[in-house]
UniProtKB/Swiss-Prot annotation:
Its EC number is 2.3.1.225. InterPro entries: Palmitoyltrfase_DHHC (IPR001594), PFA4/ZDH16/20/ERF2-like (IPR039859). This is Palmitoyltransferase PFA3. Residues 272-304, 378-422, 434-550 are annotated as: Disordered. Residues 457-470 have a biased composition (Acidic residues). Palmitoyltransferase specific for VAC8. Palmitoylates VAC8 at one or more of its N-terminal cysteine residues, which is required for its proper membrane localization. Residues 523-542 have a biased composition (Polar residues). It holds the Pfam family DHHC. The chain crosses the membrane at residues 22-42, 57-77, 154-174, 191-211. It is a multi-pass membrane protein. The DHHC domain is required for palmitoyltransferase activity. One of its GO terms (cellular component) is vacuolar membrane. PANTHER family: PALMITOYLTRANSFERASE ZDHHC16 (PTHR12246). The gene is PFA3.
Length: 550
C-alpha cells in the first residue's frame, strides 16, 4: 500500500513537471523550425526580389530577440512579497510607507492569509506559484510562471517580437507559395514546399491570434492597467477615509519577536509591519469618545441600526468606486516609461529596468480630484440627511473592539455597568430584562453545616445550652435570673461539639459519623438479651445463650 502511494506521488510529480516544461519545449521547437524554413526559403532562388539573404537575416534577428525575451520572461522572478522560503522580505534600508488605494470587496484592507503578509496595491496571490506577486498581470501557462513587476517588460517584448516574427514568416512563405508553387510545376513532386506551405498557414494563424493579444497588452500598458485590473472590478478606498492610512490595525500586527527583529535593524517593512489587505475578516479601528470612556455594549435595536447604516455606507462606497477613474493611470508617456524604463537605449531589449518597487504607487491627479469631489458630495448628502431627520450627525456608534491574537477566541466579559442585553427568548417573547430583573442572591462565603446553618450559629447555640445546663446543675438560685459566663470551656472543645450537633440531621439524634451503618449497630445492640449476673463468667465477660439454628 505504501509502495503504491509512493509511485502515485512520483507519477503526479512527473505529470506536473511535464506540464510545466512542455510549453517551453513547444515554443523553442516551433520557433526553431520556423526560422529554419525562413532561411531555406531565402536560400532558394525565387522570382521575388526581396526574398533572399536579407530576409533570412531579418528572420534570424527576430528569432534571437524572440527567444531572448522569452527566456528572460520565464526565468526572471516576477517579484513577490515573500522570498523563496516563504519569509517576508526585509529591506536593507528604510523604505517609504506603502500606499493603499485599493481594498477588498468588503471595504477592508488587503492581506493574504496564505502568505501571512500584506498585499500592496496591484498585488495578488497566485495559487499555481503559491505566492503573492507584485503588480500581477496574470499567470501565463506558455511561460509556466506569473507575469509581474520584474518580467512584465520581457513578456510584452516577447509578444511584440513573436508577432513580428510570425508576420515576417508569413510574408516570406506566402510570397514564395504565390510566385513559385502556384505558377510553376517544378515543385509538385518535392517535399520541400510542404514546409513552406505549412509555415505560411501556421504563421498566419498564430500571427493573427498573438497580434491581437499583443495589441491588447500594449493598450493596457498605455493606460497603466494590468489584465486583472481590466477584467475584474477594482474596489477603491472609500472617499471618506484617509488614503494614506498610517494607523496600525491590531489584527495585522506581526509577532513580538518579528517586531523586535525589525526594530533592531531600524527597518520598517511595508506590508509586513504595516496594515493591508486580508482574505480573512479584519475590522477597521474604531475611535473612542473624546472623554476616554469605553463604549457600552449595544442593544439589539442599536445593533440593527448600525448594520443598516453600515450596509448603506457600503452601497455608497460601491457606487463611488465605480465613478472613480483608474488611480494608476499617469498618462500614456509616464505609463510606458514606468514599464520600459527611463533609458531609451534599453527599451527594445529584455533588461529589467522597470521603475518602482511594487509597494508604493503614485496616484493619478484625475483620480485625486474625483475622490475629493465625491467626498464633498458625500458630506453634503449626509448633512442633508441629518437636516431632514433621516440620520444622526454622529457616525456609526462605537462598539468595543474584539481581542486579537490568541485572545480572540475567548468570550468578552460582560459589562455590568451598562444595560442588560436582551436574550433571544426575551426578543421573541417581547420581554424587557430590565423590568423583570430578579434580586441578587449572593451567598456569603461562610463555612456551612450540612443542614444549611453556619458553624458560628451552631457555636452560639451550643454556648447557650452549656450555660443553661451549668446554671441548673451548680447554682439553682442563679438559674432563674442570674447571669453566668463559663470561661473554662475551650474553643476547640466547643467547635467539636458544634460539629457533632450539626451532624444530627434527624430528630432521633442517632445520626453520627457512622452514618446509616452506625444507627443499625446501635439498634442491634438495643435488641440483644438482657445481661444478668448468671450470664457473666468468672472473668467478667458476658455469656450469651446460643439458641441454635431452627
Amino acid at each position: 500500500m505504501a509502495s503504491a502511494r509512493r509511485w502515485a506521488r512520483k507519477a503526479e510529480r512527473c505529470c506536473c513537471t511535464f506540464a510545466t516544461y512542455f510549453p517551453l519545449a513547444f515554443v523553442y521547437g516551433l520557433t526553431s523550425w520556423a526560422v529554419w524554413v525562413v532561411v531555406n526559403i531565402g536560400s532558394v532562388s525565387t522570382k521575388s526580389s526581396w526574398i533572399g539573404t536579407g530576409s533570412s537575416i531579418v528572420g534570424v534577428a527576430l528569432y534571437v530577440m524572440l527567444n531572448w525575451c522569452y527566456t528572460t520572461a520565464v526565468f526572471t522572478p516576477p517579484g513577490s512579497t515573500t522570498n523563496d522560503m516563504g519569509y517576508g522580505l526585509l529591506p536593507t534600508q528604510n523604505t517609504p510607507q506603502a500606499t493603499s488605494f485599493t481594498v477588498k470587496s468588503n471595504g477592508e484592507f488587503r492581506f493574504c492569509k496564505k502568505c501571512q503578509a500584506r498585499k500592496p496595491d496591484r498585488a495578488h496571490h497566485c495559487s499555481t506559484c503559491r505566492r503573492c506577486v507584485l503588480k500581477m498581470d496574470h499567470h501565463c501557462p506558455w511561460l509556466a510562471t506569473c507575469i509581474g513587476l520584474r518580467n512584465h517588460k520581457a513578456f510584452l517584448l516577447f509578444l511584440i517580437y513573436t508577432s513580428l516574427f510570425c508576420f515576417w514568416s508569413f510574408a516570406v512563405s506566402a510570397c514564395w507559395v504565390w510566385y513559385e508553387a502556384l505558377n510553376d510545376q517544378e515543385y509538385i513532386d518535392s517535399f520541400l514546399p510542404v514546409n513552406f506551405i505549412m509555415l505560411s498557414v501556421i504563421s498566419g494563424i498564430i500571427g493573427l491570434v498573438v497580434g491581437a493579444f499583443t495589441s491588447w497588452h500594449i493598450h493596457l500598458a498605455r493606460c497603466g492597467q494590468t489584465t486583472i485590473e481590466c477584467l475584474e472590478k477594482t474596489r477603491y478606498l472609500s472617499p471618506l477615509r484617509k488614503t494614506y492610512n498610517s494607523a496600525h490595525n491590531p489584527a495585522n500586527e506581526v509577532p513580538e519577536a518579528a517586531r523586535h527583529f525589525v526594530d533592531f535593524h531600524a527597518n520598517a517593512l511595508p506590508g509586513i509591519t504595516r496594515p493591508e489587505e486580508g482574505e480573512e475578516r479584519r475590522e477597521m479601528p474604531r475611535s473612542y469618545p473624546p472623554d476616554g470612556s469605553q463604549p457600552v455594549q449595544l442593544s439589539y435595536a442599536q445593533r440593527e441600526r448600525e448594520q443598516r447604516q453600515r450596509r448603506y455606507e457600503e452601497y455608497l462606497d460601491e457606487q463611488d468606486s465605480e465613478k472613480l477613474p483608474n488611480v494608476f493611470d499617469l498618462g500614456w508617456k509616464r505609463n510606458l516609461l514606468h514599464l520600459f524604463g527611463p533609458t531609451p537605449a534599453l527599451w527594445f531589449f529584455p533588461v529589467s529596468n522597470t521603475t518602482g518597487d511594487g509597494w508604493t504607487w503614485e496616484a493619478s491627479s484625475t483620480w485625486l480630484e474625483a475622490r475629493d469631489r465625491l467626498s464633498a458630495e458625500r458630506e453634503q448628502q449626509r448633512a442633508r440627511e441629518v437636516n431632514a431627520g433621516w440620520g444622526s450627525p454622529d457616525d456609526i456608534p462605537d462598539i468595543p473592539e474584539r481581542p486579537t491574537g490568541a485572545g480572540k477566541h475567548y468570550s468578552p466579559s460582560p459589562n455590568l455597568a451598562g444595560p442588560k442585553t436582551m436574550s433571544k427568548a426575551d426578543r421573541v417573547l417581547g420581554r424587557d430584562p430590565n423590568l423583570y430583573a430578579d434580586a441578587t442572591q449572593d451567598v456569603p462565603m461562610q463555612r456551612l453545616s450540612p443542614r444549611g446553618r453556619s458553624i458560628d450559629d451552631e457555636l452560639a447555640d451550643l454556648d447557650t445550652d452549656d450555660e443553661d445546663g451549668f446554671l441548673d446543675a451548680n447554682n439553682p438560685d442563679k438559674a432563674e435570673g442570674g447571669k453566668f459566663s463559663p470561661s473554662f470551656t475551650s474553643d476547640s472543645h466547643r467547635r467539636d461539639d458544634a460539629e457533632a450537633r450539626a451532624l444530627e440531621v434527624v430528630t432521633n439524634g442517632n445520626w453520627g459519623r457512622g452514618g446509616a451503618s452506625g444507627m443499625l449497630r446501635k439498634g442491634s445492640s438495643q435488641s440483644t438479651p438482657t445481661r444478668t449476673p448468671s450470664n457473666l463468667s468468672r472473668s467478667g465477660t458476658p455469656k450469651f445463650q446460643d439458641e441454635g439454628v431452627d
